[in-house]
Amino acid sequence: MQGNEMKIRLNCDMGESFGIWKMGLDEQIMPYIDMANLACGFHASDAMTMNKSVILAKKNNVTIGAHPGYQDLLGFGRRTIICSLEEIKSIILYQLGALSAFCKAHGTAVSYVKPHGALYNDMMRDENIFKAILNAISSFDKNIKLMILSSAKNEAYEHTAKSYSITLLYEVFADRNYNDDGTLVSRMHENAVISDDLEVISRVINLKDKGFLNSINGQKLFLKTDTVCVHGDNEKAFEFIKLIRKALY
């Protein structure tokens, strides 16, 4: 939570309900995480949901991050929408501004941006999209950080981010297998996701204590880690988050 001095913090996608449709167990999970990635209306969420999510995060002293995505409610932001770089900048500003308004109304602020779904993946694949997102954040508030996937290319991303005066946060997915080059194993492969909770928890503890994860072939991957992503869409995920938090803290 805010002010926590632990090396690794837990982040979770939240505030993804829409109207009468409910997604996730936000009220149950919020007390067990450190950073909440709040949807901003394009892939999920709405005005009332954003307002309630900000109130809930502040109540639990959880750091608030904007979780902007492509304008794709039907696809939940998991499909790439072809956009110009100016459009990318604009959709980031639009969503960041919306969430920031609710934060300001409740005496808090957006601390970082973590793009959602396809936009996150496209940012990591395309340097121009990465730059467009940095440009948007920098023009809005240079104190807001950008969360990206930790990889072997951290140094290059860091160099680019510095030219926009933006600080990066490095994220690791404990429940995903990694290739030897530090990239995530594609979800097209059946072994992309680690389903054994005890194995995932062991990986998180190993990452915290020794600073590395084992790749799918057993190679040590030393990944800079500011935060670990956890998911909270169902009751099983909620119980899992509690186990991870107990192991780390």
What is the meaning of each model-derived region?
Residues 13, 67, 113, 230:
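Conserved, mostly hydrophobic/aromatic
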Residues 18-50, 127:
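A short alpha/beta connector and helix-capping loop motif
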Residues 27-31, 52-65, 104-106, 138:
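Acidic (Asp/Glu)-rich catalytic clusters
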Residues 36-43, 74-89, 183-194:
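Glycine-rich tight-turn/loop motif centered on a GG-T
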Residues 38-43, 122-125, 143-152:
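Catalytic beta/alpha-barrel core
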Residues 57, 206, 237-249:
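C-terminal helical cap(s) of enzyme catalytic domains, especially alpha/beta-barrels
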Residues 73-112:
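Glycine/small-residue-rich loop that forms an oxyanion/phosphate-binding "nest" at active or ligand-binding sites
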Residues 151-212:
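Active-site rim beta-loop-alpha module in soluble metabolic enzymes
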